[in-house]
């Protein structure tokens, strides 16, 4: 049995890839149970399943009832915020709030919400700004921390966070890939910073990650996305490998499909760059995460 303890703060377990479906086509049999088992074997004790919009938040919540280790978030991703307008913003917000406050044993955060100016083709900037701000209503009403997203929108993100910081108990900016100055601004707001494969692509990314105090770090996979690729600066620091096939085979990972078990690889890169003991770092991160999302739960 492993000595490591992990909470994967961002895992997209509602994604069809974990059921063998890629781009709408069934490519292999449903291996969801195997994916979860591999994660448990490396020490993942809790999985926080990301809600990307109202429908996805409902699906994530439904999934949480299948295992005691599963929890979820409720919110609307910046690229999907046009749904507020499409369905009526008051009604949409009310539905998100109902889902949040009526499932307090399983919903641990408001999100995924924030700003994504890299993908404005999915949702205009003005719409993203309006409905990121609105989702602080959810955080304030529920008393839950926030699971936050920021891509190429640091200035606007920080501005909204500063104006609304007192309305939420705390939060984590997940999949962080910003500069050292960006990280410092988030730390000044007493936010946590989530690290996954997308946070470890370049030498600069590694230096930024190294600069973040360990008591402000969290860890995630964002699977099936954001895996550590061979071209990433951190890849050479990975010690743990998993049997992987290009074509699916039972008992194996699938090439290019990130899994929650790969959280151990994220830790290995982080610990090597920071020159810290992996077990000590994992324990610090586990406690950070437990404090934000689970400490005050009944």
Swiss-Prot record:
The keyword Nucleotide-binding does not apply. Disruption phenotype: Morpholino knockdown in the embryo results in an abnormal cell cycle progression, formation of polyploidy and aberrant chromatin structures. Consequently, the morphants have disordered eye cell layers and significantly smaller eyes compared to the wild-type counterpart. One of its GO terms (biological process) is eye development. Binds 2 divalent metal cations per subunit. InterPro entries: Metal_Hydrolase, TatD-like, TatD-type_Hydrolase. GO terms for molecular function: 3'-5'-DNA exonuclease activity; deoxyribonuclease I activity; metal ion binding. It is found in: Nucleus. It is an enzyme of class 3 (hydrolase). Keywords: Hydrolase, Metal-binding, Nuclease, Nucleus. Its cofactor is a divalent metal cation. A divalent metal cation 1 binds at residues 112, 222. SUPFAM superfamilies: Metallo-dependent hydrolases. Pfam families: TatD_DNase. GO terms for cellular component: nucleus. Its EC number is 3.1.21.-. Gene3D superfamilies: Metal-dependent hydrolases (3.20.20.140). CDD domains: TatD_DNAse. A divalent metal cation 2 binds at residues 112, 149, 174. Belongs to the metallo-dependent hydrolases superfamily. TatD-type hydrolase family. Deoxyribonuclease which catalyzes (in vitro) the decatenation of kinetoplast DNA, which are circular DNA catenated to each other, producing linear DNA molecules. Plays an important role in chromosomal segregation and cell cycle progression during eye development probably via its DNA decatenation activity. This is Deoxyribonuclease TATDN1. It comes from Danio rerio. The gene is tatdn1.
């Amino acid at each position: 049995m492993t000595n490591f303890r992990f909470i994967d703060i961002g895992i997209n377990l509602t994604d069809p890839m974990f059921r063998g479906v890629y781009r709408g086509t069934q490519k292999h049999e449903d291996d969801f149970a195997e994916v979860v088992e591999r994660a448990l074997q490396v020490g993942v004790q809790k999985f926080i399943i990301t809600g990307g919009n109202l429908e996805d938040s409902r699906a994530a919540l439904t999934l949480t009832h299948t295992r005691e280790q599963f929890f979820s978030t409720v919110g609307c991703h910046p690229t999907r915020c046009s749904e507020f307008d499409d369905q009526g913003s008051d009604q949409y917000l009310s539905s998100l709030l109902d889902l949040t406050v009526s499932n307090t044993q399983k919903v641990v955060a408001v999100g995924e919400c924030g700003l994504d100016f890299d993908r404005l083709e999915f949702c205009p900037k003005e719409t993203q700004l309006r409905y990121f701000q609105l989702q602080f209503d959810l955080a304030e009403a529920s008393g839950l921390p926030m699971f936050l997203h920021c891509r190429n929108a640091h200035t606007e993100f920080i501005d909204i966070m500063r104006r609304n910081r007192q309305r939420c108990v705390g939060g984590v900016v997940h999949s962080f890939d910003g500069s050292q100055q960006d990280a410092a601004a988030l730390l000044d707001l007493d936010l946590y910073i989530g690290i996954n494969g997308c946070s470890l692509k370049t030498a600069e990314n590694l230096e930024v990650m190294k600069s973040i105090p360990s008591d402000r770090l969290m860890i995630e996979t964002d699977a099936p996305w954001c895996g550590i690729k061979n071209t990433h600066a951190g890849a050479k620091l990975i010690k743990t490998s998993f049997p992987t096939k290009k074509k699916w085979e039972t008992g194996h990972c699938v090439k290019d499909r990130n899994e929650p078990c790969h959280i151990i690889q994220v830790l290995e890169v982080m610990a090597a760059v920071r020159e810290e003991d992996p077990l000590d770092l994992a324990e610090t991160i586990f406690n950070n995460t437990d404090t934000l999302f689970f400490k005050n739960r009944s």
